[in-house]
């Protein structure tokens, strides 16, 4: 008998038709990369994936964070004869100390002499005969579910052996995006959600030295590292933004500062994406959350983008965003009290219904191309693996 990890991938991958094999290959590749320094063996048994290793805890901790994996199960492999199956089933139920149980069987090996229902009945009957009054069958609400997978070999486990994974689609299968990463709660969650959909994720942070400290930059670097735990690696571009902000403050009206700064952030992200061959932009904006995130404000920001702009948090409540941030371990870092460029130079009464034509007129006083190119030319690059 061997203890293995059964890897179950997202059911959405089954719906990919002729592309299903590409998604499976990419997912296997990503799993192997995560386990590159852990001795392991990848086993396929009639379209089921299993991982064998002496360090099962280490494997679980890493693979559960691989996008595309929806669940891991710690299973016991037995020979494909009924006696081995029923004995292991009895052992699992005893270990669970449950007072009620149910058996579910998946018989992929059609050469096995019993069908799925017959296996479930026979294993359940054997457990009842051995444990007597200590336990009962409850098919509707059992304390423990016993699972039997019959393939080339047989695999036995319970619902207590299941570990929830992140789900989503294999990272790197759905293009690329540049995330406008701040030090707040929202943008790291947006980065995570895009990566979870298989989008290769890069980040840009706008640093306003000396108005924002090095600790603010370090905070954003830490957030990028945390998001990078779920990806193969992540690149963070730190763009100096002070000169742009000061020029806007000097030449534009106070109530237009926020939206013009947002338009410059979008321009920088687009130009950087063009240089790095990245296909889209992602922001952490949520409709109505702050003054600049009105429908009109978002339209004015989009006006300067030459590529798709994704806002995965657009319809989410703040509490829901915070819950995800806690789940992915970015929350505690995000709430550290260091200001970023979005929280300084904020006007008392920002425009909530800006118009594109007004912004175009206001920006005529600014040398847009020179400001954008200079900021990108002076940026820092950090790669976290």
Swiss-Prot record:
It is an enzyme of class 2 (transferase). Disulfide bonds: none annotated. Its EC number is 2.8.1.4. Its main location: cytoplasm. ATP binds at residues 180-181, 205-206, 262, 284, 293. Pathway: Cofactor biosynthesis; thiamine diphosphate biosynthesis. It catalyses: [ThiI sulfur-carrier protein]-S-sulfanyl-L-cysteine + a uridine in tRNA + 2 reduced [2Fe-2S]-[ferredoxin] + ATP + H(+) = [ThiI sulfur-carrier protein]-L-cysteine + a 4-thiouridine in tRNA + 2 oxidized [2Fe-2S]-[ferredoxin] + AMP + diphosphate; [ThiS sulfur-carrier protein]-C-terminal Gly-Gly-AMP + S-sulfanyl-L-cysteinyl-[cysteine desulfurase] + AH2 = [ThiS sulfur-carrier protein]-C-terminal-Gly-aminoethanethioate + L-cysteinyl-[cysteine desulfurase] + A + AMP + 2 H(+). Residues 57-160 form the THUMP domain. GO terms for cellular component: cytosol. One of its GO terms (biological process) is thiamine diphosphate biosynthetic process. The keyword ATP-binding applies. It is found in: Cytoplasm. It holds the Pfam family THUMP. InterPro entries: Rossmann-like_a/b/a_fold, ThiI_AANH, ThiI_fer, ThiI_N, THUMP_dom, THUMP_ThiI, tRNA_STrfase, tRNA_sulfurtransferase_ThiI. GO terms for molecular function: ATP binding; CCA tRNA nucleotidyltransferase activity; tRNA binding; tRNA-uracil-4 sulfurtransferase activity. Keywords: ATP-binding, Cytoplasm, Nucleotide-binding, RNA-binding, Thiamine biosynthesis, Transferase, tRNA-binding. Gene3D superfamilies: 3.30.2130.30, HUPs. Transmembrane segments: none annotated. Catalyzes the ATP-dependent transfer of a sulfur to tRNA to produce 4-thiouridine in position 8 of tRNAs, which functions as a near-UV photosensor. Also catalyzes the transfer of sulfur to the sulfur carrier protein ThiS, forming ThiS-thiocarboxylate. This is a step in the synthesis of thiazole, in the thiamine biosynthesis pathway. The sulfur is donated as persulfide by IscS. Belongs to the ThiI family. PANTHER family: TRNA SULFURTRANSFERASE. This is Probable tRNA sulfurtransferase. It comes from Clostridium perfringens (strain SM101 / Type A). The lineage of its organism: Bacteria, Bacillati, Bacillota, Clostridia, Eubacteriales. The gene is thiI.
